[in-house]
Amino acid sequence: MDVRFTEVGYTYASGVEAVKNVSLDVPTGQRLAIVGQNGAGKTTLVRHLNGIFQPTTGTVEVGDWVTKGRTIAELSARVGYVFQNPDEQLFARRVIDDVAFGPKNLGFDQERADAAVAAALEATGLTAEAETHPHHLSLSERKRVALAAVLAMETPVVVLDEPTTGQDERGVRMIASIVAALHSQGRTVIAITHDMDFCAENFERVIAMAQGEVQADGTPSAVFALPAVLEKSRIEAPQLARLAEALGWAERPLTIESFVDALPAHRTSAG
């Protein structure tokens, strides 16, 4: 399902203008990462998708729905939102109940709900913790419970707010595989992240924000090659790109595969 922001602005009651005239089209099935320092307007922008915020100016559309006037309950059928802090969305006494809440609320029949819950628990590595109280789990595990709860809803749009924060290497790989699976299913994935390596390796489009405005919009290789954008957005290029720069390479590979592919040519020139 496609998503569209048209000249969206949002001003808090305090008078702070958090989002300024942002226009974006996100096609169905795209993987989009939004990057920038804290306070850049990233979370404020995407929280318009699930109805938590309504735009001060402009319009937000999810598929053929304009979000303004739609309830959070209505929008939850189209947009699954995984919060940065999992405790904002976990409330049940058992993991399985948190994960089952969405399908039940969306009116899934029992067979479909059971299948969706089982698949979500398996995808997030939580099958063995199904009967555990979420607050007896670690932060990384609770974040995976929150993710499982959204996966079970089978929404066409999935929003991930800082999905890799607090995750170990195994957890990051698991989330990357989930993003790939969602993409293969034709679902739209929008992630807010400070993890530039995760961003570069798993998303085909990157938007850099600063002070409520879009500073750059393009492929990871294009955006991370713009020093002025990196400076204004207060972000660093991915580690492999910085390593290539330190080695004096002209190109800036962003993934392990592209870095390895470039090695033979540089070994030849060095020899």
Report residues per predicted region.
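Conserved ABC ATPase signature
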Residues: 133-137, 141
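Conserved ABC ATPase "signature" C-loop
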Residues: 211-212
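Conserved ABC ATPase "signature" region
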Residues: 111-129
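H-loop/switch region of ABC-family ATPase nucleotide-binding domains
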Residues: 193-194
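Helix-to-loop junction immediately C-terminal to a conserved catalytic motif
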Residues: 50
